[in-house]
Amino acid sequence: MIRKRRLKNGIRVVSERIAHARSVSVGVWALSGSVSETDEESGASHFTEHMLFKGTKTRSAQDIAREMDSIGGNLNAFTAKEGTCFYADVPAEHLHKACEVLSDIILNSSFDPEEFAREKNVVMEEILMSNDLPEDVSEEEACRIFFMGDRLGKPVLGSRESVDAMTAEGLREYWKRRYVPQNLVVSCAGRFDPEEFAELAERCFGSAAVRPSEPVLPNAYPGGRRVSFIRRNTEQVYITFCMPGFASMTPESYALCVLSNAIGGNLSARLFQVIREQRGLAYTVGSSPNPSTTTGSFEVYAGTDESRAAEVTRLMADELRDIRRNGISREEFLRGKEQARGSFILDMESPHAHMETIGRTALLQKREYTEAQILEKMDCVTIEQVEAVIPVVLDEANLCAAFAGRVGKARRELRNALGM
């Protein structure tokens, strides 16, 4: 059972007790992602994530690391397009310490200028690393041209230029605007006493000051058919198609999960069989739905030698056209549905997974979904629902494609393979 309450300052707290667990996972979620940023602030949410580990008024960065290591815990964070999560996974008896450390870094970070200057170099290196990975470059570019002009198309890391222009004081002001009680959720799952945790949450997070918050605008994709080529001196060309998807937790988003499994989400999927198993043209090939709060996208991707890039592109496009014309078989539907269900069950085997599920849905959906509720949504998907989303998702008029690698001489051939 999920318990929920709102602290006096407005922070929402959601928790789920798992009686058989020996550990506990606690997370703090903030409505702070790339969709929260202006062009000048691009990368600020991710940089803020880094800086909150760099010391508070009472703890140095080394103190934070040592305290968590001394209790055998794992302290980490991630930034996505719509939010940031800081979490600690610890043995159950150390929940108090985990909450104390998390609340301190979230509410009392110092943004020391010297730490900021050092960490800016770290963030720059992360951007450079991503720029060296053709799969990252291709996926980011496909997302950018698909959501052309919309904040969902912005990279979470930002750019070298935007990060280089940031100052410690400017980033601190961004943190103060985004990390306000109405934008925060605390989620906890594992073995703990619910009443004790309620008191602990109030004690650790109840002091956060109430400040005005900036709204996050709804997202949408403009539609249209676009292609982009990014030259990289790599052994492979990485190919990404980006197409329309659906908002999180909608019936259509669950139908798309099933369709994605049939297209490229498992070993028996169309693209895996046609491109890898039957022809040996690629090692990496797959598909992935990417839902957000108000809209979504769907990606199909592969990596292959430059001499085979056009053939792989043609095969990808041909399979998608065939599914658009003829749909998927009942056997593909049943396999795809059971794969979605089974993958979710396996993913939910840890307290951390439960913490993420209830925390993310509380932050973005303004309500909490249990494992059972999500499984019920999956079980309700019908083949008719999958057939209904196919013409929306696989509409060639809204297909965007990005290629990263040695693509200079092959641009015309790749365009022809796409039918562009």
Over which residues does each language-model region extend?
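A glycine- and charged-residue-rich anion-binding loop/surface
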Residues: R3, S15, A209-R211, A220-G223, ...
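Active-/binding-site microenvironments in catalytic and ligand-binding cores
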Residues: V24, F192, A220
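Short alpha-helix boundary/capping segments
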Residues: S36-G43, A247-L259, I263, L267, ...
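His/Glu-based metal-binding/catalytic segments typifying zinc-dependent metallopeptidases
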Residues: I18, G27-W29, S213-A269
